[in-house]
Amino acid sequence: MKHYEVLFILKPTLTEEEVNAKLEFVKEVLTKNGAEIETVVPMGTRKLAYKIKKYERGTYFVIYFKAPTNLIAELERVLRITEEVIRFLIVKYENKKEIAAWEKLSHGIKQSKKEIKPLDAPEIQ
């Protein structure tokens, strides 16, 4: 089984229940076809870089999963015909370096940023 990541953007006009239903639908398509879902990352509603199908915002989701290669064609077909999905991207991780990065991302380990510490300023009286 290969390592994959799918990012998809849902219409911003959907209610929270509809968004959850579409997320469950995509997860069901993956599991029915033999995928093992590692992590689902809801990224929230964000502004798009440019208008897509007359929308300026979208609700983003990323799913990290392992799957046989024949699943990808079915997933792509389902995402294309689902009206609520305005854009999607499927990424395949192939070499050891990419797979290591996939494992870090799928387990929620992110690169740590330097913490900004407040300056020690004297109190003003």
Curated annotation (Swiss-Prot):
Listed InterPro entries: Ribosomal_bS6 (IPR000529), Ribosomal_bS6_sf (IPR035980), Ribosomal_S6_plastid/chlpt (IPR020814), Transl_elong_EF1B/ribsomal_bS6 (IPR014717)
GO molecular function: small ribosomal subunit rRNA binding; structural constituent of ribosome
UniProt cross-references to Pfam families, sorted A to Z: Ribosomal_S6
Superkingdom classification of source: Bacteria
GO cellular component, one term: cytosolic small ribosomal subunit
Keywords of this entry: Ribonucleoprotein, Ribosomal protein, RNA-binding, rRNA-binding
SUPFAM superfamilies: Ribosomal protein S6
Gene Ontology biological process terms, A to Z: translation
Gene3D superfamilies: 3.30.70.60
Family statement drawn from the similarity comment of this UniProt entry: Belongs to the bacterial ribosomal protein bS6 family.
Function recorded in the entry: Binds together with bS18 to 16S ribosomal RNA.
Name the record gives this protein: Small ribosomal subunit protein bS6
Species: Campylobacter jejuni subsp. jejuni serotype O:23/36 (strain 81-176)
Species lineage: Bacteria, Pseudomonadati, Campylobacterota, Epsilonproteobacteria, Campylobacterales
